[in-house]
């Protein structure tokens, strides 16, 4: 489904100190942007910010970058973080948002700059000719490896079984070791889960959520 263009979105996100307008200029300088040397974690396809806003609140000593394609999505993610700040009465200085096509992500982050990646409920691109657009495809995993630190984890969640099983092969082919896997996350022994907006919706529909942790060897 295409998002209707919201002309007010761009001015609003540009007015936020949590928006990185020229991310390519920050390549190799993200710790300077955050004014600390803490680890930096990415959420690829952050949507409206329900997931990353919880991470930012829980982990003061980790920096987060949320990436999505559209201003019309990022604007709501920024609002979500502001709501969370008002709720806990604390400013979050450890979060930035970027609007970009993830295919060009290696132009934004430098070698060993990122310590963890989250990929939640990305587009499954079921047609074979579109498979290379999947955020877990070997083509993109190769790009992520250009800026991931050694021994880095990628956490991946989806409701799409075909994507999940294909992704297991993508990770293995790309030099990652799958350290944890479940086809029913909410009935598993994994205790660190933070639910996304989609996940909560799917849970009410009785759908099973699949999850894996893959570590870069």
UniProtKB/Swiss-Prot annotation:
Its EC number is 2.1.1.33. S-adenosyl-L-methionine binds at residues 43, 68, 101, 123. PROSITE patterns: SAM_MT_TRMB (PS51625). PANTHER family: 3-DEOXY-D-MANNO-OCTULOSONIC-ACID TRANSFERASE/TRNA GUANINE-N 7 - -METHYLTRANSFERASE, PENTACOTRIPEPTIDE-REPEAT REGION OF PRORP DOMAIN-CONTAINING PROTEIN. This is tRNA (guanine-N(7)-)-methyltransferase. It comes from Clostridium botulinum (strain Okra / Type B1). Keywords: Methyltransferase, S-adenosyl-L-methionine, Transferase, tRNA processing. One of its GO terms (molecular function) is tRNA (guanine(46)-N7)-methyltransferase activity. The gene is trmB. Residues 129-134 are annotated as: Interaction with RNA. Catalyzes the formation of N(7)-methylguanine at position 46 (m7G46) in tRNA. Substrate binds at residues 127, 159, 196-199. It catalyses: guanosine(46) in tRNA + S-adenosyl-L-methionine = N(7)-methylguanosine(46) in tRNA + S-adenosyl-L-homocysteine. The keyword tRNA processing applies. It is an enzyme of class 2 (transferase). It holds the Pfam family Methyltransf_4. InterPro entries: SAM-dependent_MTases_sf, tRNA_(Gua-N-7)_MeTrfase_Trmb, tRNA_methyltr_TrmB_bact. Pathway: tRNA modification; N(7)-methylguanine-tRNA biosynthesis. Signal peptide: none annotated. Belongs to the class I-like SAM-binding methyltransferase superfamily. TrmB family. One of its GO terms (cellular component) is tRNA methyltransferase complex.
